[in-house]
């Protein structure tokens, strides 16, 4: 049985005083194996190599697939499949971020290579990427963010709400930096910009904003409570940094702009 991944469909409706429609066409569909529950893939990320070739990074049941979407966008090809933990979570939660030529993978499963997998993407396109390290200070995680300073903020399933690792100093072998557990009530998703962290606090039904300029003295700047108690899913700033866009993982909830 196949699960169809429609990874290049984006439906955008821009609501301005003069509405504009951005129409995109479907280029291709990629198939991945799944189980009988019809849960097949999780996160999608992207990477561009030194020659300008673009790749889609897709989480699936048994690990991570890297697809070449530049050579033939109408027929993407898999250039690498990276095995990962696959036990204990039938939704296959995996999350991805890149820093330079390295890919960092966290997941909620258990099994071989449990922890944050570090993949060297620099061999592309001439040869396959290789796993070079497993950061085992965090075993299971739902979400990962890496800032411009090379700090990886990792949602920690067991223990601290957020675990911080230094990937900037040694991208192929991250080291422990700090933890962030005193203020945020919960962490489903984290996003940072300019030393400010925006944390989607899940079942706490709120978004927390924190000053992280001093990791030894993190302070709360604001808390945004969600009307109607929606599950706080994620948050992202606009380019100007003047508005925060949030979503809730609750049926019939709306995208909100603050």
Predicted regions and their residues:
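Sec/Tat signal peptide C-region and signal peptidase I cleavage site
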Residues: 13-17
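Feature marking well-ordered beta-strand scaffolds used for ligand recognition
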Residues: 18-258
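Sec-dependent signal peptide recognition
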Residues: 2-10
């Amino acid at each position: 049985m196949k699960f169809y991944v429609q990874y290049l469909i984006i439906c955008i409706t821009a609501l301005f005083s003069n509405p504009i429609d951005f129409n995109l066409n479907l280029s291709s569909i990629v198939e991945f194996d799944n189980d009988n529950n019809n849960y097949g893939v999780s996160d999608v990320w992207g990477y561009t190599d030194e020659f300008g070739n673009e790749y889609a990074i897709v989480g699936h049941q048994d690990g991570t697939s890297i697809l070449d979407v530049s050579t033939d966008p109408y027929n993407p090809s898999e250039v690498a499949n990276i095995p990962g933990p696959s036990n204990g979570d039938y939704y296959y939660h995996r999350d991805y971020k890149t820093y330079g030529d390295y890919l960092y993978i966290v997941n909620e499963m258990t099994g071989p290579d449990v922890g944050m997998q570090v993949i060297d993407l620099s061999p592309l396109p001439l040869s396959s990427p290789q796993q070079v390290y497993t950061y085992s200070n965090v075993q299971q995680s739902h979400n990962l963010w890496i800032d411009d300073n090379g700090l990886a903020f990792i949602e920690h399933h067991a223990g601290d709400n957020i675990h911080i690792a230094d990937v900037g100093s040694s991208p192929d072998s991250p080291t422990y930096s700090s933890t962030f557990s005193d203020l945020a009530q919960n962490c489903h998703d984290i996003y940072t910009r300019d030393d400010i962290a925006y944390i989607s606090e899940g079942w706490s039904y709120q978004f927390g904003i924190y000053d992280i300029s001093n990791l030894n003295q993190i302070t709360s700047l604001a808390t945004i409570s969600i009307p109607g108690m929606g599950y706080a899913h994620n948050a992202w700033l606009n380019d100007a940094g003047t508005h925060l866009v949030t979503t809730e993982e609750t049926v019939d909830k709306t995208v909100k702009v603050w």
